[in-house]
Amino acid sequence: MGQNGRVPCGLGLGWGDVDVFLVEATGVASVICYAAAICGCVYALAAGLLARGFVRSELAPAKDFPSVTILKPLHGAEPGLLTNLAGFCVQDYPGPVQIVFGVEDHADPAIDVVSRLIAEFPDCDIELVVNSYSHGTNRKVSNLINLAAEARHDVLVLSDSDIIVDPDYLKNIVGPLDAPGVGLVTCLYRSAAAPGLWPRLAAAAIDHHFLPSVLFGLKLGLAKPCFGSTIALRKTTLAMIGGFHSVVDQLADDYALGEMVRRAGLNVAIPSLIVEHACTHRTARDLFHHELRWARTIRFVNALGFIGSGVTHAFPLALLGTVLGGITPASIIVIAALACRFCLQMQLDRALGLRSNPFWLGPLRDLLSCAVFFASFFGRAVEWRGRRYAVLADNTLAYTGEVSRNANSVPSGALV
């Protein structure tokens, strides 16, 4: 170091200059965080109103009742599987309904669950397909291809194994297919949490983060989703877009199906029907890796929209602004962010008929969601059903051969 505390090499900067620069930089970063948090507060208030309006909108149940085949790919006997599947066997639907379940392995414990289902509902048209043939790297889609070969009816309904439905589900999901120009129907989902902290945190992510963000994006025309919770389409539409083979290597297979239908000139309908998604995460690791896969999936298919969603993390951003800039009058934004988040939570719970979580769970959920958001930018690997995949530039999957410690503990469906 030269005289007067100057850094040599002709940089002309002393340590005092560096200190000033760092103070100014953290001050600017603090202002940016506060500004983003204010945007997040506005979003929370608007999203709550949109959610109430969506839930109150009327459904258009089917007037005609075409024959339907429900395709259910399974893997493992996850908690509550029998109850989840039984809901599809008690549908109040006048038309013929075929249910095709499928697994890849003869030793899969889901086989016993389906056997019990067949015994409990002998009048239901239920088939079980056990087929280990792999058509590509996405094992769920590979399973669907094997199931679709057994489908006898024109309308296909796909639904993940962790989805819970009411008896009028088929009526309400098949009805919109009759509308002119509609090629596919999908629907939103809310949580059905098992007891425990991790399932409740997972449920809060769905009810208080996922749902309002999708509704907000739909209202502004920024979101074009398609969810594995439900996909209904006709065989002719599926054939027109290349069948399930066209997405057998895709990470976001459900999103890809919706995009292909739109590119074919047809619409994707999203009625106000909301099904339930079972949250049964057993450990913090299960929860984090499930949500990391979800976040990375969204980032890969809609990078700009995902980056923009960062402002929805109002409380963590306001907190970071205070950490960077110190406690100032602007720190009141932290309290405002908490108040707006609590307001959004109450409106959603009331609209969806949910039991409200303790207040402390909301800030904890917000901090976890923000951590997952930033973690999703580091790496292109995802875990699904005990296998690890690298996501390539075209959003296809490459199996890396690594197996996680809890092969059967993560819920089944891809959350997109």
Where are these regions (language model features)?
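N-proximal low-complexity "stem/linker" segments adjacent to membrane-targeting elements
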Residues: D19-A86
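Membrane-embedded multi-pass helical conduit in multi-pass membrane proteins
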Residues: L22-G27, A35-C39, L49-A51, A60, ...
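Cell-envelope/extracellular polymer assembly enzymes that use nucleotide-activated donors
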Residues: P66-T69, Q98, A256
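Acidic donor-binding segment of Leloir-type glycosyltransferases
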Residues: L85-H135
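Long helical/loop segments within the catalytic core of UDP-sugar-dependent glycosyltransferases
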Residues: R116-A149, H153, N172-I241, H245, ...
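Catalytic donor-sugar/metal-binding loop of nucleotide-sugar-dependent glycosyltransferases
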Residues: D249, Y255-H277
